[in-house]
């Protein structure tokens, strides 16, 4: 398994925004970017957790604008590629171009796993202005491997250099990942890269990322201390340790990543990013990982167990963008409980 070249994409400052409710100072952004850059990651993604223009009452407002965070990152970045995320319908072409003007040179255009067609304009525009572009098929567990691969092919046809298996709910197990990566490889052009974005909800993020690489993935998402939505993303320092054991090629300094994770990122967390009864339920139910904080808030307000809310969200097959439905579920379940008590 040696001589595999891995492109390490850090998501601490994008997916990790969910873990701190999109609240981080530009000063801390600079500290994290400086540490990641020195540690040798290939790319650093910066944006609100729900991508450019994601700050809203539905998704959660940010402590700062995307532009303030991106400017802070660009100011100290020396080596890594500055990346951002955009969800069509949330972020616009205008915002994509403004991000480019601020120094962003790579974008991941994200859609639900069966809605790749809405990414066409954004992928095409990103290519036109000279950006590296990846397609990001979220909630990849909700589509069979063959259907997901067809969606990946659409993104490739629009101009994506890479398409991701994006396990937003942390629901995929190793065989699921292998099946999806192989299906991508069977249908995509040889020159199109494949990426993996894993979550830790079932404690499988490193294992899933390793299996993905073994089956042909070259771009791997990870974050310091696993800092991300739900139980977090693939912990960067743990993945790099495995990559070293497997003798895969990458430019990362393991000890520097460990130091950044423990000394900079963990102290910022107001809720531990870990597998616990709530985050495990996210993966078990196949629920979008960013629903965690919304479900916890609704649980506290309406007195319904977080796990009950998440199981119902999974039963309803809710997807990213439907965070407001958590309150609807809580109200419905609270009314049922009151009726049963009478």
UniProtKB/Swiss-Prot annotation:
Residues 6-258 form the Pyruvate carboxyltransferase domain. The keyword Metal-binding applies. The record marks 14 as: Transition state stabilizer. Transmembrane segments: none annotated. It catalyses: (S)-4-hydroxy-2-oxopentanoate = acetaldehyde + pyruvate. One of its GO terms (molecular function) is 2-isopropylmalate synthase activity. Pfam families: DmpG_comm, HMGL-like. Coiled coil: none annotated. Its EC number is 4.1.3.39. InterPro entries: 2-IPM_HCS-like, 4OH_2_O-val_aldolase, Aldolase_TIM, DmpG_comm, DRE_TIM_HOA, PYR_CT. Mn(2+) binds at residues 15, 197, 199. Substrate binds at residues 14-15, 168, 197, 288. It is an enzyme of class 4 (lyase). The keyword Lyase applies. One of its GO terms (biological process) is catabolic process. Keywords: Aromatic hydrocarbons catabolism, Lyase, Manganese, Metal-binding. The active site is at residue 18. Belongs to the 4-hydroxy-2-oxovalerate aldolase family. This is 4-hydroxy-2-oxovalerate aldolase 2. It comes from Rhodococcus erythropolis (strain PR4 / NBRC 100887). The lineage of its organism: Bacteria, Bacillati, Actinomycetota, Actinomycetes, Mycobacteriales.
